[in-house]
Each structure stands twice: as C-alpha cells, then as structure tokens.
C-alpha cells in the first residue's frame, strides 16, 4: 500500500487556533502579536530589529533595497539556490555572480569566492541550504577583507548556531521564511528581515508599508 508523504505539512493545535481567534477578535493589522514575534525571531538571530513581511522573498528584496547599492553592482551567490534569491538581486537592478558549491555539503564553496570578487562586488548573499550551513567564519573574514556586506538567506534554517553563536552574528542582514514547508509557518506564508542597523530597519519599515512607518502599537 502506497502512503502519500507531503513535501511540507503545518502542525498546529488548540493553542495556535485560540491565538488566531484572539487576534481576529482584536484586529488583523500589525499589532502586539507581530511585534512580539519580531522580537523573538530577532533574538534567535542575535539581531536588535526584526521586520515582518509577507514572505522570505520580500525580505530579501528589502534587504537589497535598503543597502542602496549602485545600479549594476555585483552580488555573489551560490549556483545552488532558490529562484527568488536570484530574482531579488535582478529586481534590485543588480547582477548575480555565481560561485560553485561544495559537493559534500551543498553549501557555497568558500575557497572559490574570492576569485569572483571584482571592483563592482558589493555583497555576498548566501543561504543556509537543506539543513546545513556554510563556513560563516570564513565568509565573514572574506567580507571584511574586501569591504563587502553579508546577507544571510536563512529561509531553510531557524536558530542555527556555530559553537553556540547564532549564524546571524556574521551577517549585516539576515532573513528567514515562514512558508508552509519551512521550519514554522504563518498559515502558509510570511517572512522577516533582521538586522542590527537601525537605518536599515527604518528604511525597510517605510518600504514595507508604502512610505508609512506606523503600526497599531507605536510610531
């Protein structure tokens, strides 16, 4: 007898159902529940600020927009990647430059990154893929040497650490996703941008809401 195994499945109970009902009875706009969630995820990534959006893909677009790179700048990314990581680069009028992956870990081959760096290179957009993480210590060292920004695409990973230190400590901006098949889900979709840079956070907040920064709680 064949058994159907789904790619991703949401698991929730009465606690989650009650929380949704409570929120619906209050407001469907961004309020205290969103702020609490943003703060909890930011803490997981060792970041000061978290900004909820509709998807991890949108979080990547915001990350690139707030960094405000010149048109035509190059962003290094691994060739094994998710489509929206590449499309976010192109939508920002930037050029993706691909680096091969390690055949054992499926993560970006850090030994090949520097060969791809040019005068136009501005950032490294690197994911934690398929339950594994790249050599973030080495990536950070390369970024500092060449004065590059780091964007961590952690859509597949939530709370990863290296020697009890969050992978988020190595990035300028991290993002994660709450799509239906990811670690936790926001009823099918959702994402968050995370940073320690207040200017990045405030710019992203304006871009998220058509030029407005206000929520139901403050601002």
Show where each model-derived region lies.
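Phosphate-binding glycine-rich loop
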Residues: 30-74, 88-92, 98-100, 165
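Active-site region of PLP-dependent enzymes
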Residues: 29, 157-163, 170-219
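PLP-dependent aminotransferase class I/II
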Residues: 34-39, 47-50, 111, 115, ...
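PLP-dependent aminotransferase-like
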Residues: 65-154, 161
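N-terminal "arm"/small-domain region of PLP-dependent enzymes with the aminotransferase-like
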Residues: 1-28, 32
């Amino acid at each position: 007898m064949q058994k159907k195994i789904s790619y991703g499945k949401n698991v929730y109970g009465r606690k989650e159902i009650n929380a949704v009902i409570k929120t619906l009875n209050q407001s469907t706009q961004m309020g205290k529940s969103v702020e609490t969630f943003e703060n909890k995820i930011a803490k997981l990534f060792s970041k000061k600020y978290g900004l909820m959006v509709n998807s991890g893909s949108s979080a990547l677009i915001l990350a690139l927009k707030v960094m405000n790179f010149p048109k035509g700048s190059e962003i290094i990314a691994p060739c094994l990647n998710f489509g929206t990581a590449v499309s976010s680069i192109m939508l920002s009028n930037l050029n993706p430059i691909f680096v091969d992956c390690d055949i054992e870990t499926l993560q970006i081959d850090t030994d090949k990154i520097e060969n791809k760096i040019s005068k136009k290179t501005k950032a490294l957009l690197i994911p934690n893929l398929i339950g594994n993480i790249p050599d973030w210590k080495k990536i950070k060292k390369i970024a500092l040497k060449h004065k590059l920004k780091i964007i961590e695409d952690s859509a597949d990973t939530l709370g990863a650490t290296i020697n009890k230190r969050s992978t988020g400590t190595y990035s300028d901006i991290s993002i994660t996703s709450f799509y239906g098949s990811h670690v936790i889900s926001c009823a099918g979709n959702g994402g968050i941008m995370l940073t320690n840079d207040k200017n990045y956070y405030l710019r992203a907040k304006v871009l998220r809401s058509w030029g407005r920064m206000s929520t139901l709680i403050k601002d």
